[in-house]
């Protein structure tokens, strides 16, 4: 994965970009497996960025599974649309996208993979995003995201874990993926 668009957007975007470098193969494998992408009929990726996870999702998803990428950065949306012309990307914030209308057409969402920088968001935005997407998860569906190790101890990290736990039936964490830069772990929340 080319780092140039990723780094450029990190420095010039007026909205938070989730990482300075793309996720490692180990973190991507952990996230995609935890989300159950290989058996999902409908997959939503929040904040696909430059497409680091998108390629792994594309390789793992069943033939015919619906995919939607919701990205707030218009430059990255254009890059993604050019790289993955068969996938559907929208230029929108995750708090503003109409998931109800999307699900009316495509059915409930089986897997949500989020690359959003949750610890960069205040409590209000965290809750608005979660309240906009989580009600549209299928029963037994998974919401999967990751956090850099140590960031979960920050105030916004603690608030995010609490908000997720209040809205989901079950929340678990993976072991730390030390090979990622920086090291990270995965939240796996089940509806």
List each language-model region with its residue ranges.
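A short glycine-rich, Lys/Arg-flanked "PGG" loop and its adjoining helix->strand segment in the class I
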Residues: 127-139
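Conserved SAM-binding loop
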Residues: 80-81
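Class I SAM-dependent methyltransferase Rossmann-like catalytic core
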Residues: 3-38
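Conserved beta-strand signature within the Rossmann-like core of class I S-adenosyl-L-methionine
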Residues: 137-147
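Conserved SAM/SAH-binding beta-strand->alpha-helix loop
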Residues: 73, 95
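Glycine-rich SAM-binding Motif I of class I
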Residues: 51-55
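Conserved class I S-adenosyl-L-methionine
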Residues: 39-49
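Class I S-adenosyl-L-methionine
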Residues: 155-191
């Amino acid at each position: 994965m080319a780092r140039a668009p990723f780094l450029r957007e990190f420095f010039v975007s007026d909205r938070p970009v989730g990482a300075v470098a793309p996720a490692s193969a180990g973190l991507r494998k952990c996230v995609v497996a935890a989300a159950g992408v290989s058996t999902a009929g409908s997959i939503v990726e929040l904040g696909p960025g430059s497409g680091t996870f998108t390629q792994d999702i594309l390789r793992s998803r069943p033939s015919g599974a619906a995919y939607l990428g919701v990205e707030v950065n218009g430059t990255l949306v254009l890059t993604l649309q050019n790289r993955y012309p068969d996938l559907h990307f929208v230029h929108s914030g995750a708090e503003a996208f109409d998931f109800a209308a999307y699900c009316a057409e495509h059915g409930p969402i089986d897997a949500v993979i989020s690359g959003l920088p949750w610890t960069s968001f205040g409590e209000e935005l965290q809750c608005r995003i979660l309240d906009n997407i989580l009600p549209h998860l299928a029963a037994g569906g998974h919401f999967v995201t990751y956090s850099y190790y140590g960031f979960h101890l920050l105030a916004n990290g603690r608030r995010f874990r609490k908000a997720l736990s209040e809205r989901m039936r079950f929340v678990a964490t993976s072991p730390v993926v030390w090979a990622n830069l920086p090291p990270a772990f995965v939240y796996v929340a089940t509806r």
